Amino acid sequence: MKKSIFLWMGAVMLMLSSCSTNESITDSLSLSKVSHSECNYHASRTRTDDDNPYKSKLKLTYNEADQTITGEYINYMLSCDYTDAGINIEQDADGTLVLNPWNEAENLVDCICNINIYFTIRNATMQNYHLVLNRRTVTIVDQDGSEHQETWTDYEGYISFKNQNIITIDL
């Protein structure tokens, strides 16, 4: 009887140890309260990023009591003819938090503008995150006709709310 109890307890412990903490965190993160401001700072597309006096920033505020991160993507640049904009959240298998802004636009005008995107991440139970902002993968065709993929990001790094509850990242 004791042997079967120990075998049963061993099987349960093995099952519990095979489930990683990241899996439960991955399933629980969610996005809410996504909105955006109106267009500001209109400029011609022919101007360079250096001409834009309003640089993009990501501001994140951690609320431990509510287990939320309130975010603001400041000065997200897009076409003036956009019809909607927002941000998506993903979490990779390794726990990396990925925030990807998006917009719907026809891009038929010679005009760009900046908006602010506001969002809340719910069930943010950890104080440390590997954060990737605006990850996109493109296929590049080389001169010889071969193709390869490259992944670009606006930001990739580690953030910690352990000693501060507000983090601002210059992009």
What are these regions (language model features)?
Residues 1-4:
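Positively charged n-region of N-terminal signal peptides that target proteins for export
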Residues 20-171:
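Exposed, flexible binding/inhibitory loops of compact, secreted disulfide-stabilized domains
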Residues 6-11:
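Sec-dependent N-terminal signal peptides
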